[in-house]
């Protein structure tokens, strides 16, 4: 028979009492009632907050969006293949946040800030809430510094300033992304941090963009946030806010930032999908009632901060895709009313060979004029008007058989201006080159050059200035204005290039 030794029992009891942890952990737990289509209905979670992160049994995260009487509607930020009815859900008490910092530069991340480029973990300890309040009026300053895109027609006629929101709108395949990528490439050496947010795009297209940025040496100051078409609707909806949060980190450090949302139409569609599955009442075009707020709270985060706040800036270039050029649809009109101007790309102009296919007539920059450099402002004042008049006259001249000399001259000048503004993709021009090209056209110095040779003339002029007149380029780039001396040098250069071209012909 085993003898029971009291001292052994007492020592075991003492050890257990010593090891006893009396701390109590309280967690808000619920049960999955229904799961499917990226939406989970959860019973319980009484204390869940709107927008709170919830964690499912299989590790998938979700966001509590619908707080109803008897259940919580959550959207999944992942596949959620391991989630079953009856499995437990835990409220985390946190709102979605994303890692930020210099370590993010040159990386491709998903909307949760996790790297997807195969280059290892991102070593940063800083994080920032994905949703945060936009700066108030007192914290802002009016837009007054230029954000050069490197695209002559934009910098001359639709100038963009640091801290502005400028919409790029047009049908599919009209060169919207090309303008955005050119703008990123043009920021090289300007100490601007760029964030490119790809929403609902093909992974192959995003890989191509990343490769172009790498080739042009632009990836080192760019962060790419990718929520491809194959990802959950919740991630596509979150991606733009993630991009804004990453840029805000640099903005509040006093840096200039540029964010491209490509495109917000896909984000609105993802939000519509989530809202309809959550059984929220649909409105116009089946979008939920708060889709305007979805975009306005995102774009209001772009700002030029006051000196007291460090003078940082976030410039936003949202992209919207239209159907058959219809800018009066719901999402286009919403975003047009939120932004500080729009660049409208026309499929007809694109197909006629004008690249970038900017329709100058309905494109506008509401605040960029104050930020435009003096050099280009001085000469480009009449450019937009002349091109608009040319479009009108070109349409009229198709029906009129005999035109007076002044009209004929205006048409000829318009054709040459059109040719001058044509630009190759991924080849942004600096300010001095833009000034030279626009000056030659507006002042009528190339009226004798045949239309088909204008593009060649522009290329030769730029090359001549680089090799023979480097002082002109340096002076315009440093002073950013066109003095009488520089203007004389420019005029002489244009005439020399023109003479040699006409002589060769």
Curated annotation (Swiss-Prot):
CDD domains: ATP-synt_F1_alpha_C, ATP-synt_F1_alpha_N, F1-ATPase_alpha_CD. It holds the Pfam family ATP-synt_ab_C. It is found in: Cellular thylakoid membrane. One of its GO terms (cellular component) is plasma membrane-derived thylakoid membrane. It catalyses: ATP + H2O + 4 H(+)(in) = ADP + phosphate + 5 H(+)(out). Its EC number is 7.1.2.2. The record marks 363 as: Required for activity. One of its GO terms (molecular function) is proton-transporting ATP synthase activity, rotational mechanism. Its main location: membrane. InterPro entries: ATP_synth_asu-like_sf, ATP_synth_asu_C, ATP_synth_asu_C_sf, ATP_synth_F1_a_nt-bd_dom, ATP_synth_F1_asu, ATPase_a/bsu_AS, ATPase_F1/V1/A1_a/bsu_N, ATPase_F1/V1/A1_a/bsu_N_sf. The keyword tRNA-binding does not apply. HAMAP family: ATP_synth_alpha_bact. Belongs to the ATPase alpha/beta chains family. This is ATP synthase subunit alpha. The lineage of its organism: Bacteria, Bacillati, Cyanobacteriota, Cyanophyceae, Synechococcales. The gene is atpA.
